[in-house]
């Protein structure tokens, strides 16, 4: 296996950009080298003020990370707080940040929204 690949975290947003889904995630795929920052965006359905972020590690099930309601973090019990942070500003998309990515951050990240 190429050793350069081992220094990267691959972050996938499955289902991103599907017009029928209503929720838009971008970028669809993101590759970062170890130590770089990853920034994932989620634009909820129109009229929705709640956003939920989930992560699915390889060979594992979907796990809750954080629940936000416009500018407020309601529940972040599933989010590793050392390098991860999330926000949902009054205007604009919700953003999930991963600082100084490591190989173990390679996963599929999903967001969902509700009214």
Swiss-Prot record:
Disulfide bonds join 42-111. GO terms for biological process: adaptive immune response; cell surface receptor signaling pathway. Residues 22-115 form the Ig-like domain. Keywords: Adaptive immunity, Cell membrane, Disulfide bond, Immunity, Immunoglobulin domain, Membrane, Receptor, Signal, T cell receptor. The keyword Signal applies. One of its GO terms (cellular component) is T cell receptor complex. Its main location: membrane. SUPFAM superfamilies: Immunoglobulin. It is found in: Cell membrane. PROSITE patterns: IG_LIKE. It comes from the Eukaryota. Residues 1-21 form the signal peptide. It holds the Pfam family V-set. Alpha-beta TR is a heterodimer composed of an alpha and beta chain; disulfide-linked. The alpha-beta TR is associated with the transmembrane signaling CD3 coreceptor proteins to form the TR-CD3 (TcR or TCR). The assembly of alpha-beta TR heterodimers with CD3 occurs in the endoplasmic reticulum where a single alpha-beta TR heterodimer associates with one CD3D-CD3E heterodimer, one CD3G-CD3E heterodimer and one CD247 homodimer forming a stable octameric structure. CD3D-CD3E and CD3G-CD3E heterodimers preferentially associate with TR alpha and TR beta chains, respectively. PANTHER family: T CELL RECEPTOR BETA VARIABLE 18, T-CELL RECEPTOR BETA CHAIN. V region of the variable domain of T cell receptor (TR) beta chain that participates in the antigen recognition. Alpha-beta T cell receptors are antigen specific receptors which are essential to the immune response and are present on the cell surface of T lymphocytes. Recognize peptide-major histocompatibility (MH) (pMH) complexes that are displayed by antigen presenting cells (APC), a prerequisite for efficient T cell adaptive immunity against pathogens. This is T cell receptor beta variable 18. It comes from Homo sapiens (Human).
